[in-house]
Regions:
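Short, acidic/turn-prone active-site loops that include or flank metal/cofactor-
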Residues: 4-8, 90-91, 138-141
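A residue-level structural signature of the nucleotidyltransferase/glycosyltransferase Rossmann-like core
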Residues: 8, 83-84, 93, 114-116
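Conserved beta-alpha-beta core of the PfkB/ribokinase-like small-molecule kinase fold
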Residues: 26-106, 122-124
Length: 200
């Protein structure tokens, strides 16, 4: 994958302030930030500010190659920076240095985080301590474009989480968002999708 990092490459430590971080229920940090020079320091500063506001920290692992490039730093951040880790199957396997998803699930016993993991057509798995939720993928016949499916899933999941819904509901919301995005060209979510989530 050749990801264009865009405006985040211009971020500096001076840009991460109490005003820019604010006091939301959660912030999402993309793993791709680690690909810029000050990335880890930017993430740490955002975490320090957010923690002071009682804000939860979600980390998206972005892609498996990104994980391989920064595995040790990601591992450290997952251990002491992130409350929620969002990843697909390849990304979580890369982080935990396993060859298959079942081994990764077993390895999660050593972590305290909430892990929200997608498995493409196999659906998603949420692990929080002893609780595990397995959510099947929606049956979509006409898949046009999978660009943004993981991001849409993450958005739906976090929407449920910040609204204090059950992990089952969070997984359903993520699945619904992803299933809508893959039926269109491009990753832009239609405005009516929020209304659909609220009616699920």
């Amino acid at each position: 994958m050749q990801t264009y990092l865009g405006a985040c490459t211009e971020l500096g430590l001076a840009d991460i302030t109490a005003e820019t971080v604010g006091a939301p229920q959660a912030i999402l940090i993309e793993g791709y930030v680690w690909d810029i020079a000050e990335g880890p320091a930017l993430a740490r500063k955002a975490v320090d500010i957010a923690r002071g506001n009682g804000t939860a920290i979600a980390l998206s692992l972005s892609d498996s190659f990104c994980v391989e490039r920064h595995r040790e730093s990601f591992e450290e951040f997952v251990r002491d920076g992130a409350d929620i880790v969002v990843a697909d199957e390849d990304e979580i396997n890369a982080l935990l240095e396993t060859d298959n998803f079942d081994d990764s699930l077993r390895a999660l016993d050593d972590y305290q985080n909430l892990f929200a993991m997608t498995r493409s057509a196999k659906g998603s798995v949420i692990v929080s301590g002893a609780e595990m939720v397995v959510q099947p993928a929606d049956g979509v016949e006409d898949v046009l474009d999978t660009t943004g499916a993981g991001d849409a899933w993450c958005a739906g999941f976090l929407y449920g989480w910040v609204n204090h819904r059950s992990l089952n509901d969070c997984a359903r919301y993520g699945t619904h968002c992803a299933s809508q995005v893959i039926q269109q060209l491009g990753a832009r979510i239609e405005p009516g999708l929020l209304d659909e989530l609220q009616s699920l």
